[in-house]
């Protein structure tokens, strides 16, 4: 919680108004879900770390059951801690629960109300969602298979060249999770980001070192996940503070400054795409394709926010810009975080890793790389990926929903306007659904018959994990993320013996403790902090195949009119 002196002074002014709301809430007809006792007016604001609430939310879930409530100032939060409760409210009753509790700083100021992630459930969100789904739906996402294939081959080559660099050199993560450009994390990030940049802008990320564009993408995403965390700013807990003048509202200038930073980067990518389209030199990314269709409809110039009021609902320039941002965020962050967690968990569980190698050798062998058709034939690897996403979900509390009307669940009132959180962390740590939940056990999901049930499946009650959310707000990038993780992780297992740094005193592997929350970053999205890993080809034959494949890929880039890799 960030509270300035001005905010503390202003707090005195608004306590009376907040008291009225407090009294109104206390006299409702039906009981609220149980929860921890809070302070008058301020509620539970200071009873947990608002930047990392999921550990405390798990404790409260274990104490209060499937549903509990907390109060952050004037903001009522209902937390759903079982798959049954989350499925019933967020999926079955999605008509009531499909809106968002939009963070004032993160949505109104930083995003100028144009970021689809936090848009209220309404016309503009539906327009943006329709366009995103046209790119990331189950059918269209398969068209990205070639890009994922080629970019994953580049990543293998980068890891081959990287070797032990992350072990032999000293790297320090920045205060906001900034990753050094020569660390192996940056190699993975280049892969995931280049895939979605191709999809959105028709351009590659073809360089790692000395490439500020790659690192700016993650800098902006990290900043957004921090400023959008519920409770991060007092103004989110006490909305009446929004009426304060600028001199008493330092968050306002901060949010506007962050918006300018975003537009300097994302806005420039849009402008560059627009210029390339107008000059006839643009490639067929989402932005260029949309501008082409809009121009053909007679709307070449359409500045501003939102969409046109006619039935066609053409997106204006800033909504296109932020819809493109949504696709980049949906397709890159989850995938890279999943790869980092997978490597950490597999190294922490060497028996599972060895079994994955044995399966790979039996199914694929050393004469070729694994490919898409191998997915059904690698059930243990698939189980390891699923268990990774269960044990280390990238967003432990998902993205908060908002209920549009009073509702009742199991005799408890869910008041209109409440923030409603699907507590993914508590569901994934449920010992009934997942016995011994803190253990890494891929056998939970192992199906040797090859019949897979990914989290993107239609049956909400029998999904393997819940990292992609619920209902109408189900993550648009789920199909792209699952495919990107499979192809790159299968090839990582096939091509490399990867290993942790050794303790010079004991000779044992030095790995972060996956059970320690400090192993992970905080904010809306949590990823492992950087840790050292070495990569060694499993044989000289594997190494030569990786090198030859990389050379072939450069020819592919050239034939596609794309930038070749610079190393």
UniProtKB/Swiss-Prot annotation:
Heme binds at residue 475. Its main location: membrane. It is a single-pass membrane protein. GO terms for cellular component: membrane. The chain crosses the membrane at residues 7-24. Cytochrome P450 monooxygenase that is able to use 4-ethoxybenzoic acid as a substrate for oxidation. It holds the Pfam family p450. Keywords: Glycoprotein, Heme, Iron, Membrane, Metal-binding, Monooxygenase, Oxidoreductase, Transmembrane, Transmembrane helix. PANTHER family: CYTOCHROME P450 MONOOXYGENASE ALNH-RELATED, P450, PUTATIVE (EUROFUNG)-RELATED-RELATED. Pathway: Secondary metabolite biosynthesis. It comes from Postia placenta (strain ATCC 44394 / Madison 698-R). It comes from the Eukaryota. This is Cytochrome P450 monooxygenase 69. It is found in: Membrane. GO terms for molecular function: heme binding; iron ion binding; monooxygenase activity; oxidoreductase activity, acting on paired donors, with incorporation or reduction of molecular oxygen. Its cofactor is heme. Its EC number is 1.-.-.-. InterPro entries: Cyt_P450 (IPR001128), Cyt_P450_E_grp-I (IPR002401), Cyt_P450_sf (IPR036396), Cytochrome_P450_fung (IPR050364). Glycans are attached at residues 25, 81, 223, 279. Belongs to the cytochrome P450 family.
């Amino acid at each position: 919680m960030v509270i300035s002196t001005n905010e503390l002074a202003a707090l005195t002014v608004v306590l009376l108004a907040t008291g009225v709301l407090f009294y109104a809430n206390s006299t409702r007809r039906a009981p609220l879900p149980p929860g921890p006792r809070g302070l008058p007016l301020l509620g539970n604001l200071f009873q947990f770390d608002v930047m990392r609430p999921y550990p405390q939310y798990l404790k409260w879930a274990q104490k209060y059951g499937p549903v509990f409530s907390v109060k952050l100032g004037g903001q009522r939060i209902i937390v759903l801690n079982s798959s049954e409760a989350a499925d019933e409210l967020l999926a079955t009753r999605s008509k009531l629960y499909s809106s968002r509790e939009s963070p004032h700083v993160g949505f109104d100021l930083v995003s100028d109300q144009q970021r689809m992630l936090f848009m209220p459930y309404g016309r503009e969100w539906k327009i943006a969602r329709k366009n995103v789904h046209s790119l990331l739906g189950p059918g269209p996402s398969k068209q990205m298979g070639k890009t994922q294939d080629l970019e994953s081959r580049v990543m293998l080559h980068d890891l081959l060249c990287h070797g032990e660099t992350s072990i032999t050199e000293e790297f320090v993560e920045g205060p906001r999770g900034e990753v050094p450009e020569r660390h192996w994390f940056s190699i993975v990030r280049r892969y995931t980001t280049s895939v979605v940049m191709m999809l959105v802008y028709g351009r590659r990320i073809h360089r790692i070192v000395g490439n500020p564009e790659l690192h700016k993408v993650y800098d902006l995403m990290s900043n957004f996940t921090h400023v959008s965390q519920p409770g991060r700013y007092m103004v989110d807990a006490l909305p009446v503070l929004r009426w304060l003048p600028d001199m008493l509202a330092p968050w306002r200038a901060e949010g506007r400054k962050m918006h300018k930073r975003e537009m300097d980067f994302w806005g420039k990518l849009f402008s560059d795409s627009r210029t390339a389209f107008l000059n006839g030199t643009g490639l067929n990314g989402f932005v260029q394709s949309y501008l082409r269709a809009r121009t053909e409809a007679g709307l070449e110039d359409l500045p501003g926010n939102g969409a046109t009021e006619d039935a066609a609902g053409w997106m204006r320039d800033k909504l296109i810009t932020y819809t493109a941002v949504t696709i980049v965020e949906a397709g890159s962050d989850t995938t890279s975080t999943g790869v980092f967690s997978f490597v950490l968990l597999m190294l922490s569980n060497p028996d599972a890793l060895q079994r994955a190698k044995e399966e790979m050798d039996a199914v694929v062998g050393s004469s070729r790389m694994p490919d898409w058709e191998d997915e059904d034939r690698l059930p243990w690897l698939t189980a390891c990926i699923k268990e990774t996403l269960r044990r280390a979900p990238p967003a432990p509390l998902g993205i908060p929903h908002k209920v549009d009307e009073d509702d009742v669940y199991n005799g408890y009132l869910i008041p209109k306007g409440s923030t409603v959180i699907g507590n993914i962390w508590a569901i994934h740590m449920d010992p009934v659904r997942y016995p011994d939940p803190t253990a890494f056990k891929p056998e939970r999901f192992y199906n040797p018959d090859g019949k897979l049930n990914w989290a993107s499946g239609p049956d909400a009650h029998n999904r393997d994990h819940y990292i992609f959310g619920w209902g109408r707000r189900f993550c648009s990038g789920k199909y792209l993320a699952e495919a990107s993780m499979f192809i790159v992780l299968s090839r990582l297992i096939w091509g490399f013996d990867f290993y942790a740094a050794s303790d010079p005193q004991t000779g044992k592997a030095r790995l972060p403790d996956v059970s320690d929350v400090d192993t992970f970053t905080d904010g809306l999205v949590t990823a492992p902090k950087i840790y050292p890993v070495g990569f060694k080809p499993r044989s000289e034959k594997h190494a030569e195949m990786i090198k030859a494949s990389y050379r072939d890929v450069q020819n592919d880039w050239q034939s596609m009119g794309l930038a070749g890799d610079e190393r």
